[in-house]
Structures are given as C-alpha cells and as structure tokens.
Amino acid sequence: MARGDLETVPGTEGLFYYDTGMYDADEYGSVYVVDAEKPAVIDTGIGTNREGLFDAIEEALSGREPAYVLPTHAHLDHSGGAGYLARRYPDATVLAHERAVPHLVDPERLVEGTKAAVGEQWKYYVEPAPVPDDRIDGLEDGDTIDLGDRTIDVHEAPGHAPHQVVFHDRTADVVFTGDSAGIYVPDADEIKVTSPPPQFHAKQCIDDVKLIQNLEPELLCFGHFGPREYDADLLDEYKRTLVEWVEAVKQKRRELGDDEAVIEHFVKHARIVDVWGKEKSRAETRLNTRGAIAYLEYVGEDA
C-alpha cells in the first residue's frame, strides 16, 4: 500500500483505511473510515495531506459526511487533523478521552510538547486547528458510541499516553489499537516498539496489550499501520519486546553513564525499516530511546 491509497479492511464490510503519507513514508500512518448509519473517522493523521484525506472519506462514504471523529489519543499523529475535520464537516462531533479534550480545544501545549519530542520531524507537521469546545465531548472507560448499526466500546489504555483509548467495534469485532499494541509493519509482519516521551509507561503498556488479548477480536486495526488478523502470539511477542527494549536501554545507561550517548548508540544501530526509509527509522529510534529513558527516570531501578 502506498501513501494516498484507500482500501477496504479485508474481511469486513463498510470499513476502510487510508495511508496518510505521514512523514513522507508509506505504510506508517492510518486513518480508518467506518461506513455506518452514523459514519465515523477513527484517528485523523497530523493534518498534512488533509485534502487527500477528505477525498478518501468522501469516497468511502459515497459523499456522506461523518457523524463522529474519534482520535484514539491526543498525540498529533493521531489527533492533528481533528480540528480540520471539524471544520470540513460542521455536523460532526469529536469524541476523545476526557484528558485529551483540553489539548484538542487549545493545542498550544500539545504543539510545544510535540516539537520537543519529535525534533527535526516537526517539518512534516502543520499547526493543528483547534476543535471548538461545543463540538467535542470527553470519553471515559466503559463508554459506548452508538453508530446506529454498530456499537463501539471505549477502553482506557494509558500506557502509551494517559489520554489514550482503544475502540472495540463489537459488530465487526475489530479493535482499533491506537498505539497500545505497538507499530505494526505489514511488510515484515512484525510489531515494533513505540515508547515516546514523556508519559510512556512500560508496565502499563503490557497491561494494555493484555486488555486487547482479553477482548480476543477478529481483527486489529493499528494506528501504525493497517489491519491484521488478531494473533495472541504476536501480542505476546510484543509484550516481550517491550520488556527487552526497556532492559536494553537500562543496561546501556549503566554502561555509558550518559543519556545522550545512549540515545546516539541506539540511533547509530537502528534497524532500518525499508518502507519508512533511513531518516524515519532513525528518528523513531531516537524518540523511543528518549521515552524509555524518561520511564526509567520515573520508576528508577525497579523497571
């Protein structure tokens, strides 16, 4: 799949996914469109290439407009397009975790935090448009979203960020993971770690994966990237990956005694994901190392 493509999620009806071309990379950023009685858009991209997203939504919905915009969390690679979608579709309601709502209404702090986290990758972003406060409502764990012919259950998944939820479409038996189950690379059929600063919490991330395993859906729809049949073994492997990643960063900190040297070590030895390219692969590693260091600072040697 290439940036700008819209495809049907295999094995489903009325469920589509779009490659946003995030960071000028193929198969990195997904947006999902649910063609229900009350249509929904799940995740929104970073706001770049939004005209292509509008076209994809209109194609998927045969010209109808979404009733809901559902970011899985406030990080701008998932919510950065929410304000633009609210402008485009004036009857749509944005629903996000209650802790995400203030950031979407006034994104100033979110922008500052994103710039600090992503560094040079900010060149791929646009300033997010605020979501009007009368167009957005907060979600809590256990809420349901009525799409008419579908019901979506809301589950908190705060390991990646405290404002994250996963959505479970009970009708299609699909879980939209956000970043709670890592970054899926279709070309390699593997899940890579995601551990961004400042609020990554490895132990809670493992609990979030267990939550998804307890749901046992037919399909997982990853924010990064695309759908995959549910496989408990694959998620078990991701839990191990989280543990091994944090341990590797911990050991390298002990060895080098300098966090910048630790970051540069992992960037230098980053495994390049072909479909992302060298720049994005290394930037991802830099971000993840900084997040793991922040987590270790928070929990100390008990990680």
Model-derived regions, located:
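Metallo-beta-lactamase
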Residues: 47-48, 102-158, 162-232
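Conserved beta-strand hairpin/beta-sheet module of binuclear metal-dependent hydrolase folds
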Residues: 3-61, 167-178, 183
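Divalent metal-coordination and catalytic microenvironments
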Residues: 14, 34, 43, 53, ...
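Active-site metal-binding motif and surrounding structural segment of the metallo-beta-lactamase
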Residues: 50-97
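C-terminal regulatory/interaction regions
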Residues: 252-303
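Residue-level marker for buried hydrophobic side chains located in beta-strands
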Residues: 40, 70, 94, 174-176, ...
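Histidine/acidic-residue-rich catalytic or RNA/ligand-binding cores of hydrolases
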Residues: 231-240
